[in-house]
Amino acid sequence: MAAELVEAKNMVMSFRVSDLQMLLGFVGRSKSGLKHELVTRALQLVQFDCSPELFKKIKELYETRYAKKSAEPGPQAPRPLDPLALHSMPRTPLSGPTVDYPVLYGKYLNGLGRLPTKTLKPEVRLVKLPFFNMLDELLKPTELVPQSAEKLQESPCIFALTPRQVEMIRNSRELQPGVKAVQVVLRICYSDTSCPQEDQYPPNIAVKVNHSYCSVPGYYPSNKPGVEPKRPCRPINLTHLMYLSSATNRITVTWGNYGKSYSVALYLVRQLTSSDLLQRLKTIGVKHPELCKALVKEKLRLDPDSEIATTGVRVSLICPLVKMRLSVPCRAETCAHLQCFDAVFYLQMNEKKPTWMCPVCDKPAAYDQLIIDGLLSKILSECEGADEIEFLAEGSWRPIRAEKEPSCSPQGPILVLGTSDANGLAPASSTPGIGSGLSGPGSAGSGAGAAGSLENGKTGADVVDLTLDSSSSSEDEDEDEDDDEDEDEGPRPKRRCPFQKGLVPAC
């Protein structure tokens, strides 16, 4: 069956327009359109609905066309030809890998298909995106080839969706109003085959889908003078502008030709959310506590060549991203530290702006490298009162609690001594009976009581006299010194008040 399918495809690719129209009319398909559109429909028909009657009709049309050649002695098997090589405009073909036509119905970027090359060139590869699960490859990474010396170039691409793909898109859930989970996305990157490439837009990019322009992510605003604004290069969703049927879709990519080479690819993907990735991480990414404990021992193992011995390492239970207590502690396997960050907030931040950089060591921490620390998860459930722990050399741990600052206030009760207020009442005392006794006639009794308490071994109370202050005490000392001087010198002589002339007495 596979050999017959390959033979039928080779026959279809060598048909003329009239042969293609007869074949499509035989099965009741539309016969209108350009030749590459007719070839697309015929290849789609052969790949997914190749019945014995259809194969017989293809063979009949082929033998009718090549009747004279088949009558010649020594007929040779038909060689695979390019679908548009015989009836196409003389335009520059694309450079790229060998094409499997049944998989892609419209690999006619820049208007031409491609001949299979004998020397297999390495293909352009794109990095895997955690939030996009690839379902089908609609167009392999294909280089954008300029057709003229103009700076602004246009590259068209024509393809059709299979009924199964259309059904998947229609039956998928909505992530938000008008946005399906299953999408047809366009990805653009540099034409570099040395390593997987990240998405990168060419200058002056514009994407048109079936006569309607598709929105492309804009630039981030830059507040720094002289710094070019950056653009988030992400997959471009084309689903809302496509024909969700067997009709042919046409995509035109407009781009600026400034010396760099770019490639485009089309994929059918399922977009995931941060909750989906978190659930997957909890399922397959949890590291056993014993393995984490062995890692701690390895970190704290005594190195004979080192003069400094590490007896413990402190790990904070606060997430460095949001300064909150960890709920799902995780880190990358490539990180050398034991400090973890919260997987919930890390995935949410990368869903909004994908960077995938570790917030602890600022090194790449891709989703495929993330693990959930089982030991730290267990510690979080057991140690609720501390925000920091210390791992010890034998693999155990202890909580680090914040030390309270020493207080300057006295430990015992304070007795307030003072004179009676204006109403003749004694001031309030912290200990009933003691303050009033000291300020009244019964102070001796209270003093005896205080002495008795000291003799019984109890700590005495601190006595503070609030009626004394620095100013009053200094004045009292000055008055006492003046009185002493007066007593020593005797009575002072009377001073005579000088009388000024010109003054009139008041009386």
Curated annotation (Swiss-Prot):
It comes from the Eukaryota. One of its GO terms (molecular function) is DNA binding. Residues 112-272 form the PINIT domain. Residues 434-450 have a biased composition (Gly residues). One of its GO terms (cellular component) is nuclear matrix. A motif (LXXLL motif) lies at residues 20-24. Coiled coil: none annotated. Residues 426-507 are annotated as: Disordered. The modification N6-acetyllysine is found at residue 107. Residues 12-46 form the SAP domain. Signal peptide: none annotated. This is E3 SUMO-protein ligase PIAS4. It comes from Mus musculus (Mouse). The gene is Pias4.
